[in-house]
Amino acid sequence: MPITPIPILLPLPTAGLPILKSTDLVNWTLVNPAIKDVPPAEFYSAAPRHGKGVWAPCIRYHDGEYYIYWGDPDFGIYMVKASDPEGQWSEPVLVKAGKGLIDPTPLWDEDGKAYLANAWAASRAGFNSIVTISEMSADGTRVLGSPVIVFDGNDGINHTIEGPKLYRRGEYYYILAPAGGVVDGWQLALRSKNIYGPYEKKIVMAQGSAPFNGPHQGGWVTTAAGEDWFINFQDKAAYGRVLHLNPLRWVDGWPVIGEDADGDGCGQPVVKHRK
């Protein structure tokens, strides 16, 4: 008599946020995951959750610790931190609960105040194409007050702005964010002398004549040698999202990303570059 196996459902492993390290921004080594279970664990361990979970994490170093913020469009913005990125990370903290909160990036200012910029997912919030900034507690664990809209991409031009990365350079606050769509968009730079704006805007990288579509979401990195680089992705549909590394330089207070052959201040992705 044949024996029919009885299926047993076991909790699914949901470790996430893999940490990679590099000494040259080209070759990367996997270190460890920053979270053991994607929160809330009871939700994500029960079944596969396609299109949910950790969206667009942002890592920052502040006051001797590494912080990672990410948005979960169904639950809110989370944070973990560690003094050693290759060691043990803290348990996730829900910094801001809500629907549609995505792509967070923190900034600790020179006066000790902390801020959090983020975008919004229309699939959960009912709207998108805006960037908001909120003040945070100094320890980065909670948002203080209501978010302030600092840029509205519903202007018929910069729709689908998302993935903001917030920086302070000199007297200006900068937000680097892709707009125009994941596949066909461009990199937009916003700058203001006030954290809440108003912000000037400028396109600082587009596809141009390069064979790489829509240079999308990424971040600015300064090396120990003082070189500036921009890491961003290109959406290739079923092939996935391909990472690109482009040189970044500053001209008249604006970043120029990639190759700017005509000198108009808007670069395009490089096809090849010195390592």
Describe each region flagged by the PLM.
Residues 1-275:
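Carbohydrate-active catalytic/glycan-binding domains of CAZyme proteins
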